[in-house]
Regions:
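Conserved pre-motif I regulatory segment
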Residues: 1-30
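Walker A/P-loop
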Residues: 22-44, 254, 274, 299
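Conserved Walker A/P-loop ATP-binding site and its immediately adjacent core
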Residues: 33, 38-71, 256-258
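Conserved helicase ATPase core of P-loop NTP-dependent helicases/translocases
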Residues: 63, 78-89, 252, 260-263, ...
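Inter-Walker segment of RecA-like/P-loop motor cores
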Residues: 71-105
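Conserved RecA-like P-loop NTPase helicase motor core
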Residues: 98-104, 121, 275-369
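Post-DEXD/H (motif II) to motif III coupling segment of the RecA-like Helicase ATP-binding lobe
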Residues: 120-191
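Conserved interdomain linker/interface between the two RecA-like ATPase lobes of SF2 helicase motors
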Residues: 167-252
Length: 387
């Protein structure tokens, strides 16, 4: 079958106890990026009595995690998703919410529901909220980023998902800190480099209408004013030829704009670009070539923040500013998975994100009052405060 790490076993035990209890509120578990969440989900689902429905956030992640489930030796499982032309129901059913929402009656007999990436659940409405409300099922959510953006006339705020109004998830039943996993050797150490271009000024960036991030227009204007593109290309070239002569195990660049990514792919040798418009077969070809070293640099726009599993990757270039803690964490998390083929991951930030959020390994879940969870960085609150 498979062998769980101690914290994975604790997470699985807590989940099974939750489903077997008479708890009247739904719950979450917080497991950092790289902690093996898919393995924990597989173990939970396999141990539970009755039928278990596992929601995955996208067809790509569903396909990846279902394959892992089968590889662990779990056989009584199936996929219910139009994207796979498969609507089979088994003891363990992996699904996307879009395929299930119009066929809720087929799942009323399910005892247990697990939602992967549960921070995507909108308590104020949407398909998840409708499914949970109408089926009255018992739900466990798992996520590495347990917060959602809330906006009002007072501004924007990241709210811990057990503190939203209305509320779907009522309590945290298990969490493990990033720093704990680093100390146990289950995550890779990271070195950070803040390398902004000369003259870069965040004060020139403007918030969008929700306050959740910066406007495209203000970012474009600031990038043009300081010739950000030339700086980005120079940084990537320096990373390709480091002073110590040690070749990096892949350089993954995150940009905001498609045209910018296309230019980088054209101007840097052994570089390719992927975006939401890249065909699946072409994306797989590029990423496989990236993993073998045939392609040394991949520039991406709006993808590869989740579901891209390449533990050997050791260099991230953050070439976009963001006000999204989730996005920052997800991007940095691409380099935090351990591998015997890398000593440390490098995070090269060109746009002030490091100053805004701090190092990912310094993020911590704290509970100053019972069930009043928040995320802090070196003691500075990042959730449940206006920004």
């Amino acid at each position: 079958m498979f062998q769980l790490r101690p914290y994975q076993q604790e997470a699985s035990d807590a989940a099974v106890d939750f489903f077997n209890s008479k708890s009247e509120v739904n719950a979450i578990e917080v497991l950092p990026t790289g902690s093996g969440k898919s393995l924990v989900i597989a173990d939970i689902a396999n141990r539970l009595d009755g039928h278990t429905l596992v929601f995955q956030p996208s067809k790509e992640i569903l396909e990846q995690n279902f394959a892992k489930l089968c590889s662990y030796g779990v056989m009584d499982c199936s996929i219910y998703s139009a994207s796979f032309n498969s609507k089979k129901i088994s003891r363990i059913t992996f699904a996307t919410i879009g395929s299930v929402i119009h066929h809720k009656e087929q799942f009323h007999h399910f005892n247990n529901v697990i939602i992967d990436e549960c921070h995507l659940v909108n308590a104020k409405g949407g398909m998840y909220e409708e499914f949970i409300r109408e089926t009255k099922c018992k739900v466990l959510g798992l996520t590495a980023t347990p917060y959602r953006l809330s906006t009002s006339s007072w501004g924007a705020m990241l709210k811990f998902i057990t503190r939203t109004r209305p509320r779907i998830f009522g309590k945290v039943i298990y969490q493990v800190q990033i720093q704990q996993l680093l100390q146990m050797g289950f995550l890779s150490e990271l070195d950070y480099f803040y390398c902004p271009p000369k003259g870069y000024n965040e004060a020139n960036l403007r918030d969008n209408s929700t306050g959740a991030d910066y406007t495209d227009r203000s970012v474009v204007q600031e990038f043009q004013r300081i010739d950000f593109y030339s700086w980005l290309v120079s940084i990537v070239r320096r990373l390709l030829t480091p002073k110590d002569g040690k070749k990096r195990n892949g350089i993954l660049v995150f940009t905001r704009f498609l045209k910018e990514a296309e230019r980088v792919a054209n101007d840097i040798p052994n570089c390719a670009m992927v975006s939401g418009d890249t065909k699946k077969a072409e994306r797989e070809r590029i990423l496989n070539a990236f993993k073998t070293g045939e392609i040394q640099v991949v520039v991406n726009v709006g993808v590869l923040t989740t579901g891209f599993d390449y533990p050997e990757l050791d260099t991230i270039v953050m070439a976009r500013p963001t006000k999204s803690l989730s996005l920052w964490y997800q991007i940095v998390g691409r380099a935090i998975r351990p591998s015997p083929y890398k000593q440390k991951g490098w995070i090269v930030d060109l746009c002030g994100n490091l100053n805004r959020f701090g190092k990912v390994q310094d993020l911590e879940l704290v509970e100053p009052k019972p069930n009043m969870w928040q995320v802090v960085s070196n003691g500075r609150p990042l959730t449940n405060v206006n920004f």
